[in-house]
């Protein structure tokens, strides 16, 4: 099950970095990997807190360094394969023209950010808020509170 969920996280990280028009293949890969590690720094502490993941000790809210090393290795390979397989020009155009293209990342940030907040995992909460702010700044949060009918 986990490899199936890994692919959308990698894709979302690549798309997220595309919002910032990072120039250069190496910078784009590095930025995508940094985004993926940041996503993992939100996901794994929450999963450990909920008992979904269980490690025998870990320095970051119960998550061991070896987990992040695994993400670096598998993430680098996955990002390179994905960037080689996709037409990044068309992907960037699609991202620009499709408001909901990163909606699952918005949901991810909200869900896992709230779980981390509940368990007082402060650093993951800050990372989730930063993701949320970046997504909001790039018009990826389509929450029209002013249009809601409040009774």
Residues of each region from the PLM?
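Aromatic-rich, lipid-facing transmembrane alpha helices and their immediate juxtamembrane interface loops
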Residues: 1-151
